[in-house]
């Protein structure tokens, strides 16, 4: 039995973001949504891969640039998807280049959000993912 799981939580989310301020804001935004639980957070590649594998979230919210040089958020997704193919992903980044958007999609991300332009869509997208509707 998973003792970290809140009764009634419909969706478990893991947050991977190198900036503590942004990570805390994302977690605040997630906690405002009913029936969604934050099961972990990380700021670097190893902590992200280990945390996601241990908590097995429904959704990973991943920044591309992480706090170390071991790998990017896209590398994290490529690694954990081998074991968790059903996990959904939202990539959040300041690097909204065609290459990053394509690499995110290739890694299986359902959404790519530009932090400067799309940040406020984050909760709307999580709500839609929770209810099973597609927000594309």
Listing of model-derived features with the role each one plays in the protein:
Residues 96-113, 117, 124:
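Alpha4 helix (beta4-alpha4-beta5 surface) of REC/receiver domains from two-component response regulators
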Residues 74-85:
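Short amphipathic alpha-helix used as the core "switch/output" element in two-component signaling
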Residues 1-14, 20-21, 121-136:
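Non-catalytic signal-transmission and effector/linker regions of two-component phosphorelay proteins
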Residues 41-59, 67:
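Acidic, metal-coordinating helix/loop segments flanking the phosphotransfer/catalytic sites
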Residues 44, 70-75:
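Acidic catalytic/metal-coordinating carboxylates
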Residues 20-40:
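Two-component/phosphorelay signaling modules centered on CheY-like receiver
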Residues 60, 89, 112-113:
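Two-component signal transduction core modules
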